[in-house]
């Protein structure tokens, strides 16, 4: 039994479920249908849940000025309401172009002079910083004749990519500077051996045996703890029998 357990953990570390879950959430080049993208695709301000992925802005009823605008943040949809498979992602982590991740090096820090420099996990620990990457969203603004005009009949007037937040990056995830693929791009290599990867981690003051799976917030390592919820999204109240 011990041999089977050891064999399993050679390919799956103890925190693999944390890293795999975060990678599934993260919007990266190899994950166009990330959970981040799905959240943006389902954005809706309508009470009935229609117009998913878009925001309609209409002028006040008493005002004669203003335009009917449609702001699209999600991916394009067909007439059947389904996401078009060829539609490019609209949310990007660490870069304004998700289709080009060649320049992505992991989390960054904005220095006092306004310049941005790569931030390694060790530097974040020593400087009491947050290990984060910027998140960008592509906004498309269309002008409509009325509040009921379909998106496909509206006129495109502007497109812009906007930084919306900074996202904490899990150590050893696809968005971390210690990720094997990110390290390979940083060293400008086609591939990297286990020995070369371990040597790189040591050069960054990291333990090659560290499985990751945690965040660095304010220089402190923070880990998510899995709990079994008895009743999700419900408040449980018990009567005090003593009173």
Indicate where each model-derived feature is located:
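Conserved N-terminal architectural modules of multi-subunit, DNA-dependent RNA polymerase core subunits
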Residues: 1-243
């Amino acid at each position: 039994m011990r041999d089977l357990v050891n064999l399993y953990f050679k390919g799956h570390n103890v925190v693999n479920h944390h890293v795999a879950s975060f990678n599934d959430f993260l919007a990266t080049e190899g994950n166009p249908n990330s959970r981040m993208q799905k959240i943006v695709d389902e954005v809706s301000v309508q009470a009935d849940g229609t117009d998913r992925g878009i925001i309609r802005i209409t002028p006040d009823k008493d005002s004669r000025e203003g335009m009917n605008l449609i702001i699209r943040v999600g991916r394009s949809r067909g007439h059947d309401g389904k996401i078009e498979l060829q539609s490019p992602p609209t949310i990007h982590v660490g870069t304004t172009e998700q289709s080009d991740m060649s320049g992505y090096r992991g989390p960054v820090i904005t220095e006092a002079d306004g310049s941005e420099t790569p931030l390694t996990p060790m530097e974040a620990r020593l400087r009491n910083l947050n290990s984060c990457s910027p998140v960008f969203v592509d906004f498309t603004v269309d002008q409509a004749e009325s509040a009921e005009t379909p998106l496909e009949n509206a006129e495109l007037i502007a497109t812009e990519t906007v930084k919306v937040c900074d996202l904490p990056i899990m150590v050893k995830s696809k968005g971390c500077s210690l990720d094997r693929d990110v390290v390979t791009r940083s060293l400008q290599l086609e591939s990297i051996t286990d020995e070369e990867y371990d040597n790189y981690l040591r050069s960054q003051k990291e333990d090659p045996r560290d499985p990751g799976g945690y965040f660095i917030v304010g220089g402190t390592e923070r880990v998510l703890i899995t709990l079994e919820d008895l009743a999700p999204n419900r408040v449980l109240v018990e009567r005090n029998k003593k009173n």
